[in-house]
């Protein structure tokens, strides 16, 4: 996949993410599906909104060491956001990610090895794809939260943001 193809693919993840965030009921931020160790709705909104920032970090080859990344992530997932807060954060982080990726040379996108905190060094496009899929997984998680809460979401909401 080339850089333009990736950006098109990532836009397809972003658009429904923004729509799903906007549908989250602000009065249910403390809700989670059962007495299990998962994020609350508010924590998930915050986390989903910050996911694109990691794509910008990957594009800059600027991930911190694994222990520092893990510690920061553990702290970050404890934070919560309302839909009104998460929406603008998602948009800002998405714009920064797109700008950073657009600024890459195609050769670097395709072949530059970068350090990632979750495993051995990998090719830039693979790290970006991993982070895009991470966001996609949390988009699906939010979709399921909203479905369980009885909101009128469906396949078009999940994949087209409608």
Question: Where does each model-flagged region fall?
Answer:
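Short, contiguous alpha-helical
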Residues: 7-11, 15-18, 28-75, 115-162
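Acidic/histidine-rich alpha-helical segments that form the ligand environment
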Residues: 75-115, 122-137, 141
């Amino acid at each position: 996949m080339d850089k333009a193809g990736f950006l098109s693919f990532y836009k397809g993840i972003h658009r429904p993410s923004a729509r799903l965030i906007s549908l989250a009921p602000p009065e249910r931020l403390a809700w989670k599906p059962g007495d299990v160790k998962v994020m609350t709705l508010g924590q998930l909104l915050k986390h989903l909104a910050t996911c694109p920032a990691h794509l910008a970090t990957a594009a800059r080859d600027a991930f911190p060491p694994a222990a520092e990344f893990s510690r920061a992530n553990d702290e970050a997932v404890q934070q919560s956001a309302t839909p009104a807060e998460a929406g603008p954060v998602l948009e800002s982080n998405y714009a920064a990610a797109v700008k950073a990726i657009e600024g890459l040379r195609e050769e670097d996108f395709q072949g530059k090895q970068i350090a990632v905190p979750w495993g051995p060094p990998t090719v830039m496009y693979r790290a970006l794809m991993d982070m895009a899929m991470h966001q996609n997984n949390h988009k699906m998680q939010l979709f399921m939260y909203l479905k369980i809460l009885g909101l009128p979401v469906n396949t078009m909401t999940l994949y087209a943001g409608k």
